[in-house]
Curated annotation (Swiss-Prot):
GO CC annotation terms, alphabetical: cytosol
Pfam family for this entry, one: Rib_5-P_isom_A
HAMAP family the record matches: Rib_5P_isom_A
This protein's UniProt keywords: Isomerase
NCBIfam families: PRK00702.1, rpiA
Taxonomic source organism: Haloquadratum walsbyi (strain DSM 16790 / HBSQ001)
Keyword Endoplasmic reticulum belongs to the record: no
Protein name: Ribose-5-phosphate isomerase A
Superkingdom of the source species: Archaea
Listed pathway(s): Carbohydrate degradation; pentose phosphate pathway; D-ribose 5-phosphate from D-ribulose 5-phosphate (non-oxidative stage): step 1/1
Subunit structure: Homodimer.
Enzyme class: isomerase
Length: 236
């Protein structure tokens, strides 16, 4: 589920820093969420300044935001590669392992983020933690709801079917699936848990992003901290 915290200014700083990794002519994966939206706005400014880029959106909401920002769009089926993906995170540790899916777009996000030559994570400093502990979203085929929940419970999760807020019934993703939010407490071995979740028949995608992110731009009150896969850190 979505976490709260972090100012709009921190998100703006993270988004603007991430756009520095985008070159003229790039195909850019466009993530979902409030900090990814800040990056989309910054990309829109780059387009207005003359950059020739095309975006590949990860959700209907992202598509609409990109159109408003003036970013030309394409579909992943229409390109043979993605140069850079910029996406947010609900929680991130120093190894750049992420929990995503607060916006229920993690299935599409994982495809696009993994396809990109470089995946840049944007977040405010409230999302940076030593140990991941947020509930892990698991998108599931509706017909597999009962057996998937049983398997998730057997892994030690406290499992909640995500409910819609503006209608009765569960949240339905852009791909027509339901979402379980799975609380495991402190996640000491994200790679092993990711493997176990992926092996459950009926799951479509889970929100653990392991060994995918190349760079994280973390907005702070004083600037932006940049983390790389080797855990080097800088501030701008």
């Amino acid at each position: 589920m979505k976490t709260t915290g972090g100012s709009e200014e921190q998100k703006r700083r993270a988004g603007e820093k991430a756009v520095e990794y985008v070159n003229d002519g790039d195909i850019v994966g466009l993530g979902t969420g409030s900090t990814a939206a800040a990056a989309i706005d910054a990309l829109g400014d780059a387009v207005a300044a003359g950059y020739d880029i095309h975006g590949v959106p990860t959700s209907f909401a992202t598509r609409d935001r990109a159109i408003e920002a003036g970013i030309p769009l394409t579909r992943i089926e229409a390109v043979d590669h993605i140069d850079v993906a910029i996406d947010g995170s609900d929680e991130i540790n120093n190894n750049l392992t992420l929990i995503k899916g607060g916006g229920a777009a993690h299935a599409r996000e994982k495809v696009i983020d993994a396809t990109a030559d470089q995946f840049i994570v944007v977040a405010d400093e409230s999302k940076l933690v030593e140990t991941l502990s947020e509930p892990v979203p698991v998108s599931t085929l509706p017909m597999a709801q009962k057996p998937v929940k049983h398997r998730l419970d057997s892994l030690g999760a406290t499992t909640t079917l995500r409910s819609a807020t503006m209608k009765d019934g569960p949240v339905i993703t852009d791909n027509g699936n339901i979402v379980f939010d799975c609380a495991f407490g402190h996640i000491e071995n994200a790679e092993a848990l990711a493997k176990s979740l992926a092996e459950i028949p009926g799951t479509v995608a889970h929100g653990l992003f392991v060994n995918l992110a190349d760079v994280a731009c973390i907005g702070t009150e004083n600037g932006t901290n940049v983390y790389h896969g080797d855990q080097d850190q800088g501030q701008n």
